[in-house]
Amino acid sequence: MATITLPMVPTNEQQELLVQTLAGIRSVLDEQGAELIGGHTMESRSASPLPASLGVQITLAVNGRSSQSPWLKSGLQPGDALLISRPLGTGVLFAGAMTGATKATDLDAALKGMACSQHTLLEQLEPVRGDIHACTDITGFGLLGHLGEMLQNRTGLKILLDGAAIPAYSGALDLFERGISSTLAPSNRAAWRWLDNTVQLRQPPSAALLELLVDPQTCGPLLLACNSKAAAQLTQNGPWLRIGNATTG
C-alpha cells in the first residue's frame, strides 16, 4: 500500500508527478516480486518547493509472508563466524556532506551501494539456511549496538572482532579522523561499554575505528552469524566479509 502526498501545483503537473512516482515504486517492487495493491493520494497544504518533485512525500506499508521460520538476532552460538554484507560509514559521510567535507566521489560511491537492494543475498543464503544461527541488519544503532543485541541473554558468549577486516566506505575513516561524526553518534557511543569485556578487538583500535563501530547506518549491511563451513562458502564469492567470531570464556 502506498500513500503519496503531492505538492500544490497545477493538476497536469500533479498527474505527471504521480505517474512518475508510481513507476519508480513499481520498478523496485517488481524486481523483488512484490505487488502494489492500492493506496491513497493526498495534496500538501504547504508551499510547493522548486523543483516540485521535492514536494512529493511517499509512505509505504509493506507486509510479507514466509513459509519458513525467520532468522532472529538471538541465535548466536559459540564458534560462529560473523559476516557483513557491505561497508559501514554512511552516517559520517552524510554528516560531512552537510558541511562540504565529504568528497563528491565518496558520496556518490556510497549512494550507489546504498541503492542496491540486498534481496538477492537471500537467494545466496538459502543453500546454507540451516547453518545460519542469527541475522539482522545494521541500522541507526551502528554495528556495535547490534552486536550488543545479539549478545543479550547469551551468558558466557563473547565476540572477537578483527578491526582491520571491518569494511568502510571510501572517505569515512578520514572524516572520523577530522573529528566529523553523525548527530546520532553521541548516543550510540554508549555501546562502547560492550568493549569492556564482551566484545573484544584483536588489535588496539584507532579513534576512527571506534567511531566506525557506532556510526549510524542508512541502508546498512546485513550482519549474520553462521558456522565455519557456511562462512567459507559465503565469503568465497562475495560480497560477504568475515569480521569476527563468537567464542566462550
What is the meaning of each model-derived region?
Residues M1-T5, T105, L121, R154-G156, ...:
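Solvent-exposed, charged interface segments at domain starts and junctions
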Residues A2-K103, N245:
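Glycine-rich anion-binding loops of enzyme active sites
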Residues T11-E35, M42-I58, P127-I132, T136-G249:
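Glycine-/charge-enriched secondary-structure boundary and capping motifs
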Residues A61-P70, T105-V128, P205:
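Active-site glycine-rich loop that binds ribose-phosphate moieties when present
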Residues P87, L107-G113, W194-Q200:
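Short acidic/polar alpha-helix capping motifs at helix-coil junctions
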Residues G89, A109-S117, C135-L143:
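Short, contiguous, pocket-lining structural segments
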Residues G91-A95, C116-T120, L144, Q203:
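Short hydrophobic/aromatic-rich motifs at helix boundaries and adjacent loops
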Residues A104-L111, H133, L184-A185:
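Adenine-nucleotide phosphate-binding core of ATP-dependent small-molecule kinases
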